[in-house]
Amino acid sequence: VGFATFYPLEGKKVIELGTGLRTQEQALQEAETFFRALGKEPVRAKDAPGLIFPRILSLIINEAVRSLDEGVAQAEEIDVAMRLGVNYPSGPLRWADQIGLDEVLAVLEGLQQETGDDRYRPAALLKKMVLAGWLGESSGRGFYKYNET
């Protein structure tokens, strides 16, 4: 049984359990019991690239980056629209900064390679930012500027 957690871990109640071809039902039930005891709500997913949440979130972040690059709106407006429009805890660009732009890029590149699907082709601006060392909160600069420590 594989599993995936989400950033930031605290406050996230869901955990994804990846089921492979040889995964036994008993193993899944034991994993579910274990994670429920930790206060998590397990969801089952076929063992596929990205499972559920990372696969979908990466597309949302990538489209937000493309929208920014195309001048559809500024970063703050994109984030406010998503926070208020669909009740996200954070906008996709701020979330990307928290995760790390290098991590987001790696997920997108991995999904594109694994699936062969161009939906996961990373936005050009995302690649440029990572090459420039703008990795988000960890580097002090991403879609937003942060206090460097």
Regions found by a protein language model. Name each.
Residues 62-69:
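Short glycine/serine- and small hydrophobic-enriched flexible loop segments
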